[in-house]
A protein has these predicted regions:
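Cofactor-binding beta-sheet edge motifs in enzyme active sites
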Residues: 1-222
């Protein structure tokens, strides 16, 4: 696929004391749309596809329909795998019916597979997202949920959140981030024996700028 992960902007937000992180294809107004349509009280959303609550629960918001094909479970697992989340603490919710979750990434993904010249991709991206937003489209079909939302969205969101949580833990402990590891929704510093749950770090992590192109796991790491 010829679409770079760098075309996907990740955002984070404080949601009731937790961390919400999502992705959008070059949509700088995504955070404004979210706050105008979804925010309640002090909660703030920024294209939220992944949420971590203080009690260490992880919620994955999916903008595709589940019709028995297993896409909801698969997409949540792709995010959870990159996040190193404890699966028993992961829940799945259908994304709200707002243009924030419009599935314009499907058209963008197909354009990449069809070999559209790179100089046309910015126009394709802008047009696809605008059409999807106008129709509030949360489309399901063409095996696109896993290929595009999963590979370009859920994996990137999970990897970005993991890096943010590690950064927060490392700063709190005063240790290098590369000395920290993650497993089952916890960040560990083995040298000192310290551990923090994702829920404990979520509020601080929400204040960080998400990495634009986080490092994804190799197949051998799954």
């Amino acid at each position: 696929m010829k679409i770079s992960r760098r075309r996907f902007i990740l955002s984070s937000a404080v949601v009731g004391g937790g961390l919400a992180i999502g992705y959008a294809a070059t949509r700088p107004s995504g955070h404004r749309i979210a706050n105008d349509t979804l925010a309640e009280g002090s909660a703030r959303y920024l294209t939220s596809f992944l949420r971590i609550d203080p009690d260490n629960r992880v919620t994955v918001y999916v903008n595709h329909s589940e019709m028995g094909q297993g896409s909801h479970t698969a997409l949540a697992m792709m995010a959870a795998d990159e996040l190193d989340a404890a699966w028993e603490q992961v829940r799945i919710e259908q994304a709200p019916a707002t243009d924030l979750y419009a599935a314009g990434d499907m058209a963008i993904g197909f354009a990449g597979e069809f070999g559209v010249p790179s100089f046309l991709m910015p126009l394709i991206e802008a047009s696809a997202m605008k059409i999807a937003q106008i129709g509030n489209l949360q489309t399901t079909g063409g095996s696109a949920s896993i290929r595009f939302t999963g590979q370009l969205g859920m994996r990137v969101a999970g990897a970005a959140a993991r890096e943010m949580l590690i950064q927060c833990a490392a700063e709190r402990w005063g240790v290098p981030a590369d000395e920290c590891t993650t497993a089952l929704s916890y960040v560990h510093h083995n040298a000192s024996g310290q551990s923090l749950s994702y829920g404990e770090l979520a509020d601080a992590a929400a204040g960080l700028e998400p990495p634009e192109a986080p490092t994804l796991k190799q197949h051998t790491q799954f």
